[in-house]
A protein has these predicted regions:
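A hydrophobic transmembrane-helix motif
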Residues: 50-91, 147-194
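ABC ATPase nucleotide-binding domain helical subdomain, centered on the C-loop/LSGGQ "ABC signature"
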Residues: 318, 332-367, 412
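Helix-to-loop junction immediately C-terminal to a conserved catalytic motif
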Residues: 292
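An intracellular "coupling" helix at the cytosolic face of ABC transporter transmembrane type-1 domains
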Residues: 19, 36-44, 97, 114, ...
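Primarily ABC-family ATPase nucleotide-binding module
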Residues: 128-130, 225-275, 279, 460
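Short intracellular "coupling" helices and adjacent cytoplasmic loop segments at the cytosolic face
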Residues: 8-32, 36-38, 111-135, 225-234
Length: 468
């Protein structure tokens, strides 16, 4: 139950953590925590009874031996405490090495991610593949091997030291018993009892590094600084009666980097079809994430119908949007408005409008796909977002991966259809041939936002590159 709660709570915390923070962490540390750290805590939870059993038996046996001879018990306890103290010094090195191993694990997960996600690029460049394999993977794997050997060496040293001292304690028992004038029977009872206790004590010592590994895992999870655990999701119904969204004197900055957005002012009216153009790196995608509430402005104000968007209502505000970003993840489960089952007639309509009827099959409300091109994947993402039936649809260079014929269909046919359905469209685009289909044309230039007047729009349509 403990491990179940930890796993589910960790996933919920990731869901509730601001996207910018998760992006900064990267997927490798999160995957390492969800796999390696959870596994370490699971193992520790299984080994915990051994430690508890060893402690309880030691206390019970101590009371029994104390009834036979307190002086002899105190001397043996001093012997055992000394043994444990030295073992603890050895185990301290185990903990230090386990902490280092956990850091190496993060690096290894990054290497695995590079090998899997960069497989096409690596296949085309064997020099890069060799460098990744030798300079990164082999180096990290070697560091892991050496560090785990060190940790195991200290652990085995602690176990062997405990074994030797426990057997030596038997000789001490008979020597001290003779010195104190105790009977041979009492000395034999002490010796046999100590031999009986050897296994539980060694099991407890063996379980201790596992518990230390779990402590390292907990420390690593806490170092992620994820959002506090909240069992509930935002369930408030979306208010579709909004009229305008305003950005006033808005700045955004990634941690200690230069300002990405500078004094941005924008009013987005319901039903608008807005195109945003600009050079690569000008801040277009960042503006999109701030507008949708995914990123929190560094300065300035985001508001809807005059109501400021704050931490208390930002999650509810985000429910107004469906978005397709450049790194869109496609979920196979289709979801309709407010999380209800999708309208299948709407699904099939858009499946045909997006020319996916021969590429994607739909079983129930789940997508079943063969291999799709990048452009077809973007169309599939469009299908999943349209059936959500959100008020605002944001598309980040969605048409860039479409062939010329379907790009024309998108601008000349799909955009008017979505507008007729009452959707507000915010589209990041470089397609200067289709700027006339926008109600408004915005230009992002070096972090600043400019709305183009009719004359500037003509120039942008004639030669978009010169405007950037």
């Amino acid at each position: 139950q403990f491990v179940y709660q930890l796993r589910t709570q960790l996933v919920k915390q990731i869901l509730d953590t601001p996207v910018a923070q998760v992006d900064h962490l990267g997927s490798a540390p999160l995957m390492a925590s969800l796999s390696t750290d959870i596994q370490a805590l699971t193992t520790a939870f299984v080994r915990m009874p051994e430690l508890v059993q060893g402690i309880i038996l030691s206390l019970a046996v101590s009371l029994y031996l104390g009834s036979l001879s307190w002086p002899l018990l105190l001397i043996i306890m001093l012997w055992i405490v000394t043994t444990i103290w030295i073992s603890t010094l050895l185990v301290k090195h185990v903990y230090q090495n386990l902490t280092h191993i956990r850091d190496i694990n993060d690096a290894l997960y990054q290497d695995y991610q590079a090998v899997i996600e960069g497989r096409k690029e690596l296949a085309l460049n064997q020099h890069r593949a060799k460098n990744l394999y030798i300079q990164d993977l082999i180096r990290h794997a070697t560091a892991y091997k050496k560090t785990i050997i060190k940790a195991d060496t200290y652990h085995l040293s602690a176990v062997n030291w405990s074994n030797i001292m426990m057997f030596a304690a038997i000789g001490v028992i008979f020597a001290v018993a003779s010195y104190l004038g105790l009977s041979l029977g009492i000395a034999t009872t002490f010796a046999l009892t100590l031999l009986f206790m050897q296994s539980p004590i060694l099991h407890a010592v063996g379980a201790y590094p596992t518990l230390q590994t779990a402590q390292v895992a907990l420390d690593k999870i806490q170092s992620l600084q994820l959002a506090d655990y909240e069992p509930q999701f935002v369930t408030a119904n979306t208010d579709n009666n909004w009229q305008s969204i305003e950005l006033r004197n808005l700045d955004y900055q990634y941690s200690s980097q230069d300002m990405i957005l500078k004094q941005v002012n924008l009013t987005l009216n319901k039903g608008d079809v807005v195109f945003l153009i600009g050079a690569n790196g000008s801040g277009k995608s960042t503006l999109a994430k701030v507008l949708t509430g995914i990123f929190t402005p560094t300065r300035g104000q985001l508001s809807i119908d005059g109501r400021p968007i704050t931490d208390t209502n930002r999650a509810e505000y985000r429910q107004l949007f469906s978005a397709i970003f450049s790194d869109q993840y496609i979920f196979k489960q289709l979801i309709g408005p407010e999380g209800n089952p999708p309208d299948m007639s709407l699904v099939h309509h858009w499946q045909h409008r997006l020319q996916l009827q021969n590429k994607v099959s739909i079983e129930g409300s789940k997508l079943s796909t063969d291999k799709l091109s990048q452009g077809q994947r973007k169309r599939l993402a469009m299908l999943t977002t349209v059936v959500e039936d959100k008020d605002i649809l944001l598309l980040d260079e969605w048409a860039a991966d479409q062939d010329p014929a379907f790009r024309r269909t998108f601008y000349q046919s799909l955009i008017p259809e979505l507008k007729a359905l009452g959707k507000t469209l915010f589209i990041i685009s470089h397609d200067d041939s289709y700027f006339e289909h926008a109600d408004r044309l915005l230009l992002m230039k070096q972090g600043k936002l400019i709305e183009l007047n009719p004359e500037q729009r003509k120039q942008a349509s004639a030669d978009a590159i010169s405007m950037l």
